[in-house]
């Protein structure tokens, strides 16, 4: 059969579900779309065309972020595309673009990428469980560490839904600051291992770090945090 359904008896979270699906997969490439998102009807055809032009272990596409209010209405739309419409990047070139990908919110997601299953298997790549918010970027940093090549499709073919209610990124997460500090540290270590941690990279990482600090402070002020005034100051 072309379609098989696999499930967990109890909800073990996103990473565990992806790992189970990855273990059950038989196709050459795997994709991890979120169930409440949408994508252009040409998404898979565009990925196929890209791979026909140049094989690669990973294909990354542009995306649109749709911000929904509590009533389910779209209140804002933002596109995230690449400077090039379509391209193949070898190991050296893709490494030089990683920080640009992170700034453009491309690097940290799994749903905007299609992965060659054999490459994931050979590298032993699976998603780390019980790692809120940064499971995708942690996975991608490991996958990209020795990635020999990457195909990029500039068109925004994936539509990511960000909702005021129900989306993990909109919920209060007690360890928000700690996990994003870990995110910056992982990026720093990767760039350093590639010999790309120059002054410009440090400045960019510093700006990203400052953004996460401000975001953490804002979240601590939310009533959902349950934090007292003294706890917020700490």
Segments and roles (model prediction):
Residues 159-234:
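C-terminal subregions of glycosyltransferases and related glycan-biosynthesis enzymes
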Residues 30:
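Short aromatic/hydrophobic "clamp" motif used to bind/position activated sugar donors
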Residues 1-7:
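Acidic donor-binding segment of Leloir-type glycosyltransferases
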Residues 14, 35-153, 158-177:
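Donor-binding/catalytic cores of nucleotide-activated saccharide
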Residues 20, 46-50, 186-193:
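A generic secondary-structure signal
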Residues 16, 110-111, 221, 231:
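Generic N-terminal leader/processing signal
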Residues 8-25, 35:
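Glycine-rich, basic loop-to-helix element that forms the pyrophosphate-binding segment
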Residues 25-26, 52:
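Residues immediately N-terminal to the Walker A/P-loop in ABC ATPase nucleotide-binding domains
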